[in-house]
Structures are given as structure tokens and as C-alpha cells.
Amino acid sequence: MGTSSCGDHEKQRIEDEEQYGVLLYYKYTSVPDLDELVSFYESSCNSLGLLGRVRLSPKGVNVTVGGKLTALEEHIAAAKSNCLFEGTDFKLASCHHPLNDKVAEECGFTSLSIRVVEELVTFSPCPPLKPPEISNAGKHLSAAEFHSVLQSANGKSENKELVLLDARNLYETRIGKFESENVETLDPEIRQYSDLPTWIDQNAEKMKGKNVLMYCTGGIRCEMASAYIRSKGAGFENTFQLYGGIQRYLEQFPSGGFFKGKNFVFDHRISVGSSKEDIIGSCLLCNNTFDDYSPRCRCRLCRMLVLVCNHCRVKGDIYICELCRKHGKGEVPLSLDPLNQPSESNGDNTRRKLRILCLHGFRQNASSFKGRTGSLAKKLKNIAELVFIDAPHELQFIYQTATPPSGVCNKKFAWLVSSDFDKPSETGWTVAQCQFDPLQYQTQTEGFDKSLTYLKTAFEEKGPFDGILGFSQGAAMAAAVCGKQEQLVGEIDFRFCVLCSGFTPWPLLEMKEKRSIKCPSLHIFGSQPGKDRQIVTQASSDLAGLFEDGCATIVEHDFGHIIPTKSPYIDEIKAFLYQFI
């Protein structure tokens, strides 16, 4: 009986594994009621136990979720009952349960994330680029048609030249791509999809007057990219895309066909290969054949995934990807004298600047903070690009004078608010009921969850970022994110923080005196009590005390509620930042 029972349990375990799957689909369409669509996904995915990512915008949906196959099939049936999803290609694949918790967490498959975004995939670079009209996207070719075109090109010369264009990132193309004799394959070797428009602009002549066959993982990236190519006009009309992406092609041609290697996927499977299981990837260090990303090794500088084989991989080692090496960053010493830096504008040796997300203080906005930090930005121009965003909580316009100020009200925002927070009135200015309290920051204990969700979207749409800089309440918000950094892997990734005139936010109060935050941090605040009339010196000092010994660098100045840009303070700021270049 015992043996039979064990056998039954094992059989059930295998059946459970066989019942698991991953579902991918997208649809570009006008969404008449976004709130209703959000409610549909919240209800359907939660009731069916689906985990993964759902991205919604006024222009459509992009979904990658996992769960029991029966649950996924039920979700598909529910979606198909809505005319919004007419013609949608639901790509459902059976697979094993997530076996590696770290990989599942990084891929977002340990929770359900439903977000409303501006772009289903972030095609726009910084500064923002107007997205091309999706109605102008390249013609869809089925897997069989795509294969036939490549097969014909192998046997005879076409009337027009044919090129293959891979719309994916470098870490994807390393382990798998289409290869065909007599057909040139263009690999942009980009870190992220938002770099593709610039590459297309710089390499347009390679595609002009030719038949361009585009492909990506599941098809969505080709929709926007092919429309962008076709928007260039005459000579770019013959741009085509593989419908259903590599996934549908491998389903049609299980042995791989013209696709060599493995298809990188953004879920716990990591990659999916053909029956041939050929390996085209290689170890970053020894160049031996290798294509397994499950160790999750990343470039120290840009955080892109890299391939490091089991023989070369040593815990604590630092890796520099081929792109950073190509642009000279891999030759930069880890410790530098900030006062004797070489020029950073020498052609191909130009190093990528650090990208730093800047969080303003309470009752400020991105524009005003950018203005206040103009001198800082100028002195860091060869080191860092500062990116400013408004906080999500809009505040009332408050005045204390006898009559309200005249002129247009510039919106003010906050990351954290008090429990009696009131949304702005439609009438404009509101008279203050009492004097402004210099200790009001101590009562700002609400709004963190909304701000955290907002930052996740900012990182997804405007990232990647190397670090976060926060001022006053913005520093408190940045510190709170640092405290949750391990829980936010894959959603909010950064390597350091700069906290100016900060204080301990309520999410970190329970950590007081524990020095448990391991994120490298630079703390800048006034050393003389009373000089900073907004945030007392001790509050900023206490915040620095939450960061682990060896992680926190402190710069104390003789001024008030500002970020100093004179020597020696600016030299100390540069010295900290140069560690990450």
C-alpha cells in the first residue's frame, strides 16, 4: 500500500507539472473603457490564480501570465467573449512549474502585476518620440510564409535584395537567431527596445530599397518597429514581420528550420529551443559554448544579462558586458581620482553617462527641481544624465497672505502625504488654516504604495537607471525603495542612491538603528543645527544610520536646505559617482 501511495503521489506531481503553462498575447486596438478592462483582468487573473504581467493602455493590451493550463484556457475563453480581442493570437505553451524562485521573481512570475502604461512596449527613446501609427505596420507573414521566403532566397536570387532584421535585445540574440545563406541578418546589438529607433535611423540605408523580414519573440515589438521603418517613406514599403514571432515559427518547425539556438523568453522558462537543441551562445570570459541564463549574471555597469559558464563563474566576481567593453567602459578602473579624469568625449571611447532618476521634495515638481539643480547638472554633465519626474500625489494650492496669489497655478506634488490629505480643489488657491509646520514631514505617513507603483512604471517606461537621487521628501521616498530593493528585483533595479536632506520615512521606522540597508548610498545634508529649516540635521543623520557600514558615504556641508555644488562638496559627489562608471 505504501509503495502504491508513493506512486500515486508521484503520478499526481507529474500531472500537476504537465498542467502548468504560459500564455502570451497582445492586441493593438482602441480601448473604449480602460477602467473596465483593468477590472476584467483583476477579476479573471485573481480568480484563476494567474501570475505574471498585464500591461494596458488606451491603445491595447500586452499580457504574459502563467498558471494551470485549464485556468489559462478559461482566461482565453473569457477574453474571446469580448469583441475587443477579436483576431488576437493567444500563444499558449505547456511547461514545467517555476523551479528557480530567483528567476521566477526576476521575471515577475511570483505575483500578478496589472498596470496602465503609456506604451505597451517602450519604443520611445528619451527625449520622447511620437510613436508611429500602428496601422502602418509591416505585413504579417505566417511562419510557413516566412520560411518559404528564406527557402526561396537560398535557392535563387530575388529581384530585390532580402535582409533579416532582429528586433530583439543583444542578450536575446546571443543565444538564438535566424540564419540563412545568401541573406544578410542585421543584429542591432541593443540593450533595450527603446534603443531600436536610433539604430534604425543610423542604419536606414542598409534597409532602403530591400525586402526587410523582421522578427522578435512573439510579434509585438515588430508591430511598432516595422511601422517606424515604413514611416520613412519611399524605399521602405517592403517591410514584413513574422506573425506570432519566433514562438509560432518553432511550433511550425519543431526542428528549428532557419532558426538556430534558443528563443529567449521573459518568463521562468528563460529560453525555449528546437528539438535540435543547438547552442550558439558563448561564455563571456572563455568563449566556450554556453547559453544558460539561469545563474542571472549581469554586467556590473549596465546591468544587462551576461553568459558566464559554470567553470568561469565565481561568487562575487564582476562582469563587464561586450557593449560596455566596446565603448571603453570596461577599461575604467574601479577606483578613480575625480579631480584627474580623462576626457569623456573621445569618439568611440566615450563612456555611457550614468542615468539618475531624480525625485523632488514635498510641494515641488519636476520642473522646479530641475531648475534648482541646474548648477549640479552642469557640473555633472560629463558623468550623469539627470531625469526628473513629478510625484503622483497632486497637492492643493495653499497661501497664507490676505489675498490669493495672482497668475497661473503651477501644480505641486508629493511622494508621501498626511492622513488628512485632500485632493486639489477645482477653484484653485486655498487659504491655509494654520502656519506651516516645519515638522510636517513627520506626519506624512500615507501614499507610499501609490508612489511605489508609480516608480515601477517610471522605471519600466523611462529606464533603465543606474541610480536614484532624492531631495528632502524625495530622499525619504528613495530610501524607502532602497529598503525594499531585494523585493523589487526586475521592477526597480538600480545600483546606488544619493539622498539629500533626507529623513526616515515611515516604511523604514521599524528598521531604525539596525543598519540593514545594503545599497551604496551618498548622504548630503547640513552639519550645523538650525541652518536647514525644513529637515533637522539629526533626521538626515539618522537616515544615514539605516545603511550598512561600508555602504554609506556622508557629505556634510555648511548650508541650508540645498544641494551644494561648490568645492569640496562637488568633488566628493563626483568621487562617489565615479565608482559606478
Swiss-Prot record:
Residues 158-258 form the Rhodanese domain. SMART domains: RHOD. This is Rhodanese-like domain-containing protein 6. The active site is at 216 (cysteine persulfide intermediate). Pfam families: FSH1, Rhodanese_C, UPF0176_N. It comes from the Eukaryota.
